[in-house]
Regions:
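Patatin-like phospholipase
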Residues: 23
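An alpha-helical repeat/solenoid feature that recognizes helix-turn-helix modules
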Residues: 1-15, 29-70, 74-119, 126-177, ...
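Membrane helical hairpin/interfacial module
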Residues: 18-20
Length: 219
């Protein structure tokens, strides 16, 4: 948010550099950032690395940025999502981090296969539901036992925005209504994170209401 980077003099240059040094040292295989964890760890680490490359275009980061993206592409399930292990049938929570990393990679100049994006859009259809497809569940469409939570609606809405799957006005309106109805809630930090991303992308009254309450909570 501040534009701090490891390759130019700035207030937190050393912190960012040391953080990147530590992060790159965690690679356990070509492009594999899971460490002793799972695909959650990989997705979050991949997002950080690709963002660092995208901001700086540091050629030393390019091979690793490409590697972590390739690992995501190769780990995608045939239905288009991701879960704890490579190739496992997806859930929307883990998949959200992969979609963010892929979108960041594409914006940074790393090519993403068309088939990968088609898979993501297909997965969003699987976990989508509601009247116009703008409500999202965890591993299945809302209405089933493990679906329909506010956080998952926010993740699905944001992923749809990143993949341009929310171009359908009715679908986007339904997603926005759910987000607006739930409102900002700092007690659920995961929902607050994704809800902020989705509300900001959507803009309009939904974002204005969201940011007003968020500022009151934080400031």
């Amino acid at each position: 948010g501040r534009g701090e980077r490891h390759d130019q003099q700035c207030k937190y240059q050393d912190n960012v550099r040391r953080g990147l040094d530590w992060l790159t040292a965690q690679e356990v295989g070509i492009g594999d950032m899971r460490g002793k964890g799972n695909m959650y760890d990989h997705g979050i680490a991949a997002l950080a690395l690709v963002e660092a490359y995208g901001v700086t275009k540091d050629p030393d980061l390019r091979p690793m940025a490409q590697g972590v993206i390739d690992f995501i592409v190769d780990s995608q399930h045939e239905e288009g999502g991701w879960r704890y292990k490579p190739g496992e049938r997806g859930d929307l929570s883990v998949s959200g981090w992969m979609v963010m990393a892929l979108a960041s990679g594409e914006m940074s100049g790393i090519p993403i296969p068309k088939k990968t994006w088609e898979g993501v859009r297909g997965f969003l259809e699987i976990v989508g539901g509601g009247k116009d497809g703008g409500s999202y569940g965890y591993t299945d469409s809302p209405g089933k036992a493990n679906s329909g939570k506010h956080a998952m609606n926010a993740v699905g809405f944001f992923c749809a925005q990143l993949t341009r799957s929310s171009a359908n006005a009715a679908k986007a309106f339904e997603s926005a209504l759910i987000l607006e109805g739930a409102g900002f809630n700092l007690a659920d930090i995961y929902y607050a994170y994704y809800g902020t991303l989705a509300a900001y992308q959507h803009q309009g009254p939904v974002w204005r209401k969201w940011i007003k309450k968020m500022q009151a909570e934080y400031l």
